[in-house]
Amino acid sequence: EAWLKLVAQIEKVRGSRGYTDRSGRPRAPEMLLDRLKENNLRNLCNNAVAVGGTFGARHYLPSIDLIGNPRLDLVMDAHSGQGHRPIAIDTLIHKLDPALKPAKRGEPFQVVVHTLYRQKSFFTEANDGTLYADEVECLLDLHEARLEQQALEFLEKLTPRKNS
């Protein structure tokens, strides 16, 4: 029940913007993630952009039933970067892949940027320095990508079991 309430209120918690490649030769989400991990892009993010979606879900639950990655979900902390210049998402997207442009209605997304408006992001840093969005953000990304079976599997992992 709490999950349904959260999904119904999602626009109040975060905003999303999709990007697509109209060149006819889109890069694989894995390639885009590798580019994001390069030092110059990581520094541009000022620790305010984390990986979510299928990549994030797999970070938290390696056994999740996923075949491939349909897109790269990024989560930007709108309250991060105090003392730093604000992150220009369009600049970051252009550096990831110059062919990525804001998607029009009905176009598939190669990258989706979700902007968090809450006070704390709860990002987790992996051993390689990659920031991952928290489990709830990854769950919302799976739902938004219409990966319902995987979202339910991930939700089950997140739901504490009561001892009977």
Residue ranges and their predicted role:
Residues 3-115:
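Short gly/ser-rich loop at a beta-strand->alpha-helix junction or flexible surface loop bordering the NTP-binding
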Residues 79-164:
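C-terminal regulatory/effector modules of DNA-binding transcriptional regulators
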